[in-house]
Amino acid sequence: MPQPYELWWSVVPGPSQLVEQLTAHLVRFESALIPYTTASFPWGEEFRLSAYDRVRQVHPNLTEELCDASTMGERSPGRWVLDVVGRGEVFCLPSDDPIEIAAESGLLKQRIFWVTHFTSKAQVAEWVAFAKALRKKAADHCCCVVLLLPTSLRINSHLPELETDAFFGEYDLSFFASFLLSHRKLSQFEKKYLSELASALSFGDAVQCAELASVGKELLEEPEQLPMLRAIPNHLHGIWLAQIRTVFSHIEETKFAIVQQHRNAIAALLHTTDDFGIAIEQMEDIELRHLIHAVNHNIISLPERTCTVINALYNSRNQLAHHRILP
């Protein structure tokens, strides 16, 4: 049995929906991961104070005021609480140097998932900087930074800054993808693939999902060879494979949605040249671009000459007459 993982997250008021979702995923992946159920998380005052005494032994300068401040307010890297799921401890990190305190108290010795909510883009930027600093500090350990962003705060430009083991996304898929990426035995190819897949799923990039689908299927051809499966007990392999296939199923649904979205135009393309010209001339630029991607990435299958005409139209659309027959 491998060393049980530990989940860390910044405290939210009460057992929120996010906590319940994360717990459900953890319980499904590995029963040894956490001994609690969603109904028995120790959120009470008695638990918090007893944990405070334990933390003070590690860092004597920790004040009760800082611990009390953890009951909420701003959840920035300077004032926060870490719940150690499975050990029943709470670490309250003071605002001067939370990374240093985390290192001194041994918090970086296990795989760590940092999960939080955001209310502004400024908070996102602050956590990006903090995550980068943490990664540098914990270079010899296996840390995984997970930032869960609401749709309104998704910022693509931050993704590369956090390297391949960080992920912005929806609650369910983000945790799954990040959990996979935390495995140190993954090859660089697999890490890069899973990171890109997570990004595509998160930001609704249907085209990128389609591009990654074929790569993902190759990973599943010989699942027993996957490092991520060798790192966990045999009896859990089926669960992991089911979850991976669920992600790929999501990609297939995305591809199907593209076809459905443009089904009328696609049907028109398969008729006479005149009808074909009328149909594509009436398509918006973005629709035509989606259609081209769908063809080029084998999402749909069209005759070769039809594909040639589609690309020619897209490249020289402004110079075409309404019924002009393309070479």
Task: Identify the residue ranges that each predicted region occupies.
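Extended, compositionally biased accessory segments flanking or bridging domains
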Residues: 1-107
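Amphipathic alpha-helical interface elements
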Residues: 21-30, 38, 52-53, 95-112, ...
